[in-house]
UniProtKB/Swiss-Prot annotation:
Transmembrane segments: 22-42, 63-83, 112-132, 138-158, 188-208
Gene Ontology cellular-component annotations: plasma membrane
Taxonomy of the source species: Bacteria, Pseudomonadati, Pseudomonadota, Gammaproteobacteria, Pasteurellales
Family annotation (Pfam families): MIP
Organism: Haemophilus influenzae (strain ATCC 51907 / DSM 11121 / KW20 / Rd)
Keyword terms of this UniProt record: Cell membrane, Membrane, Repeat, Transmembrane, Transmembrane helix, Transport
Membrane topology: Multi-pass membrane protein
Descriptive protein name: Uncharacterized aquaporin-like protein HI_1017
Cellular localization per UniProt: Cell membrane
InterPro entries: Aquaporin-like (IPR023271), MIP (IPR000425), MIP/Aquaporin (IPR050363)
A single GO molecular function term of this UniProt record: glycerol channel activity
C-alpha cells in the first residue's frame, strides 16, 4: 500500500492495476506459505467463519485471533521502519494514513459497512466452496487470487477493501503511535467499520454455506 499511496513512488506503476495484482498475489503467497501450518488463517474473519461452520476448534479461536493481531502489528512496524523517509516526505495526510489503514471515499458509514459486508461475504464464500470441493492446490490458489483481486477491482474504490479486522486496526494503531512527520488523524472514529463489517460478512457467508452444503 505504501507504493500505492506515497508521492515519490506511487507513480512508478499504474497504481490501481498493481494494487490489485499485489493484493491478490500477497494473499496467494500467504496461503501457500502458511496453509500447511495453520490453514492460512491470518484473518480473524476467516477464523470466526470456519468456527461458525464447525471446521475450526473453539479452543483455538482466541489464540489465533491474538496471533493474527500480533502478526499484523509486527508487519505494520516493519512497514513504518522501511518507508519512514517516504512517509515523512508525503504532504498528503490521507496518503500517509492510507499506507497503513483503509480510508472510505465517502462519509456514509452505513454504505461503507454494507460494502465491506458484501466484499467479505463474497471472498469467504469462495473459500468455503474451495474447502468443500477440495480442488488441486494450483486451482485453489488461482481462485484465491481472483477472489481477492476481483474484490479490490469491484469495491476497492469505496472503502479500500479492508476484509481483515486485524490488518486494518493494528496498522491504524501503528500510524497513531509511531512518529510520522506532519501526520494527521488516524481516524479511529471510522475504525469500527473495517473491524466489524468483515466479521458480519464472514458470518453471513457461513450461514449461506451451511444452508446450501
Amino acid at each position: 500500500m505504501c507504493q500505492y499511496f506515497l508521492k515519490k513512488i506511487r507513480n512508478v506503476w499504474e497504481r490501481w492495476f498493481t494494487y490489485r495484482l499485489w493484493f491478490g498475489l500477497s494473499m496467494v503467497s500467504i496461503a501457500v506459505i502458511f496453509g500447511p501450518l495453520t490453514g492460512a488463517h491470518v484473518n480473524p474473519a476467516v477464523t470466526i467463519d470456519f468456527w461458525e461452520v464447525g471446521k475450526f476448534p473453539t479452543e483455538l479461536v482466541l489464540v489465533y485471533i491474538i496471533a493474527q493481531c500480533i502478526g499484523a502489528f509486527i508487519v505494520a512496524l516493519i512497514v513504518w521502519l522501511l518507508f519512514k523517509d517516504h512517509l515523512d516526505e508525503e504532504d498528503n495526510q490521507n496518503c500517509q494514513l492510507g499506507s497503513f489503514a483503509t480510508i472510505a471515499t465517502n462519509s456514509n458509514n452505513l454504505r461503507n459497512l454494507l460494502s465491506e459486508i458484501v466484499t467479505t461475504f463474497s471472498l469467504l464464500f469462495i473459500l468455503f466452496t474451495l474447502n468443500h470441493q477440495q480442488p488441486t492446490n494450483g486451482v485453489a490458489m488461482f481462485f484465491v487470487f481472483t477472489g481477492v483481486a476481483g474484490g479490490v477491482m469491484s469495491f476497492g474504490g469505496l472503502t479500500s477493501y479492508a476484509i481483515n479486522p486485524a490488518r486494518d486496526f493494528m496498522l491504524r494503531l501503528i500510524h497513531a503511535i509511531m512518529p510520522i512527520k506532519n501526520k494527521g488523524t488516524s481516524n479511529f472514529d471510522y475504525a469500527w467499520v473495517p473491524v466489524l463489517r468483515p466479521v458480519i460478512g464472514a458470518i453471513l457467508a457461513a450461514w449461506l454455506y451451511k444452508a446450501l452444503f
